[in-house]
Amino acid sequence: MTVSTERAVLAGGCFWGMQALLRRYPGVISTRVGYTGGDVPDATYRNHGDHAEAIEVNFDPTVTSYRQLLEFFFQIHDPTTEDRQGYDQGLSYRSAIFYTNEEQKRIAEETIAEIDASGLWPGYVVTDVEPAGPFWEAEPEHQDYLERVPNGYTCHFVRPNWKLPRKQDAGQTAAGGDR
């Protein structure tokens, strides 16, 4: 039996921490880190110009939806800081969603609007939403880095309070006057 997969391309700071968390998310089949969103061909760690460090995620849409993947993405990095995650600063560490089709674009924009309206995050989302372009796979030493170096650097963690209420819950919250 062949599993149907979808592809997501996300950037949220250093790709090591993003990959370590996303690879374990239910429905994720494979991940690889690389560079995208810039103008340098054949990007490498030493020469990636204005590309973002990104992660390509292949997932089973019968197990997890693109929306669920994005909600988790927004929990594991700070989408309210421009060109920065933790101590890492610069365009390489920007928050971005690189959509592969118009449906992904719509879902990304809708999710960002709901996050901004929720008031749960410390500021407004600055995540770029851009069409996916070439993805340059990072060098082998960057793939699954935190699997090989468990105490290696990361600034990514799950923020339990940064979770959007389910849509039906959101209506109940508004009706209950909690917001």
Curated annotation (Swiss-Prot):
One function term, GO molecular function aspect = peptide-methionine (S)-S-oxide reductase activity
* E.C. no: 1.8.4.11
Per the Swiss-Prot or TrEMBL record, the active site comprises 14
Does the entry feature the keyword Cell membrane, yes or no?
no
The UniProt entry's sequence similarity note says: Belongs to the MsrA Met sulfoxide reductase family.
Q: What does this protein do?
A: Has an important function as a repair enzyme for proteins that have been inactivated by oxidation. Catalyzes the reversible oxidation-reduction of methionine sulfoxide in proteins to methionine.
Q: Give the protein's recorded name.
A: Peptide methionine sulfoxide reductase MsrA
Question: What would be the name of the gene that encodes this protein?
Answer: msrA
